[in-house]
Amino acid sequence: FAGTLGLCVLAIAIIAVKQRKTGVPVRLPLLLLGLIIFQAALGMWTVTLNLLPVVVMGHLLGGFSVLSCLFILYLRLRNTAYKLPKNNDTPSASEMHDNAIGDLPQAKVFQRNLRRFAFIGLGVLVTQIALGGWTSANYAALACTEMPVCESGWQERIDIAGAFSVPDADNYEFGAHDYGERVTMHIVHRFGAVVTFLYLLALGICVLVSRHATDKQKYVGAFMLVALCTQVALGLSNIIFMLPLAVAVMHNAVAAVLLLSLLNLIFTVFLSLENDQA
């Protein structure tokens, strides 16, 4: 699968370079190609460095980065296709309304603020994904099996410095950190989940209730909230049911869906501001 993906991205990059004069994005496909090459190296290092946690987490983040770049490329190409004239027809009223933000200064201010807060949300979400990757790479997903925080006495086990360091070991399979450090990783990931949930929940609700948000943004905001609630349910299920494989895989998959929905929201903001300036 990895080889097929690499060949597809290589083909995309070659086509983009050849079609660069037609307005097709070039830098993004080239960035994708570089990410694929780096991903291949991380995959090799995962084996040769005996599951070094930094490499395992980097491999996960690299996969999310490749998926994000592919999605952004899709959005840009779709938007370019929509801009192409079709039999000299003018856009319909519904098409113009979908991305219009109006002439009111408040609408423009809302879009600029939404762009800022959506980027902050992206940073929060990526940080939480990285924390999840670090927790998983160090086999700390089951370090805490009680709610809402951890087993009693967890306060005495907190070791931030140790939890986010890489101990010397010949092999990192099944983890090389002690129990207290794994508890710390798990708890930080839980608190990160709370922060991420509250922030994205507030962001999504603001989009839904604002009269300055476009129809597309409201749709994306609603989808993001559904993905967010699903992700929380999957995270709780991982703890309650002791990390079943299917739930763990879905937890990663929905994290990717949540990331893509947030990227889509950001794209709609740029599209609205761009249409307003045109």
Regions found by a protein language model. Name each.
Residues 1-91, 95-278:
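Polytopic transmembrane helical bundles with strong interfacial aromatic enrichment
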